[in-house]
Amino acid sequence: MNTTKGQLYLIPTTLGDNDPMEVLPMLVKKVIEDTDIFIVENEKTARRFIKRITPEKSQPSLKIFLLNKFTEASDLPSFLNPCLNGTNIGLLSEAGCPGVADPGADVVKIAHDKNIKVVPLVGPSSILMAIMSSGMNGQSFAFNGYLPIDKGERKSEIKRLERLSFEHNQSQIFIETPYRNNKMIEDLASVLENNTDVCVACDITLSTEFIKTQTANAWKKNKVDLHKRPTIFIIHKS
């Protein structure tokens, strides 16, 4: 590997609006202090995060590359040109760890193809923290992203994941758009078998954090308001 190349730092961010230094190690602060080029999903929120970590850092001097659903795949290799010229780049997620349920994975793959060193930094991952605290199988689990919006398709997918969990003894993880969270927990309680375990991990790392695992039947009786709150759902059928 060419040691004169810059490195691609994978920089975790907070999962909410709490103090970054409550959940991020000092190394993250140091890397941000020493980096002026960033690949981000949203420039406004990324700049706000950088300012909270390093208030003294000059914002006008930052170079920002946008990586979101509007970014052309053909543009991605050029984002890493500074690394080829010996300059480090930071890859930021909107929340949590870059490359995990995050478009940053495409840039990381290109970095490997170009023999650019990839350096993951320590930080919160809502997916891992949810499975850690669920009491479910942390040896075998799968993240399934978003479930279908259509009522019939969603019901079929919930039943399919329940079957997979039972057949493979595998925890099934998924998410929902926050304003549909309450509908999701209602659907899980009504569609799953009564003894299937359901974990709701909401507002992870925040002062309003709520994490609870109980059966689908118990969720019918114990209501919780998840509206517009970042939530991870996990099911496991024994």
Where are these regions (language model features)?
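Glycine-rich, flexible N-terminal cofactor/catalytic loop recognition
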Residues: 1-67
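A contiguous loop/helix-start segment that scaffolds small-molecule binding in enzyme catalytic cores
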Residues: 2, 6-9, 87-88, 166-238
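Class I SAM-dependent methyltransferase SAM-binding "motif I" and its flanking Rossmann-like core
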Residues: 9, 106-164
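Short glycine-rich anion-binding loops that position phosphate/pyrophosphate groups of nucleotides
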Residues: 15-17, 94-98, 178-179, 238
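Short active-site oxyanion
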Residues: 32-38, 115-119, 171-172
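Alpha-helix capping/helix-boundary segments
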Residues: 44-46, 96, 126, 180
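Conserved helicase motor
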Residues: 65-72, 147-151
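Glycine/small-residue-rich loop that forms an oxyanion/phosphate-binding "nest" at active or ligand-binding sites
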Residues: 68, 76-118
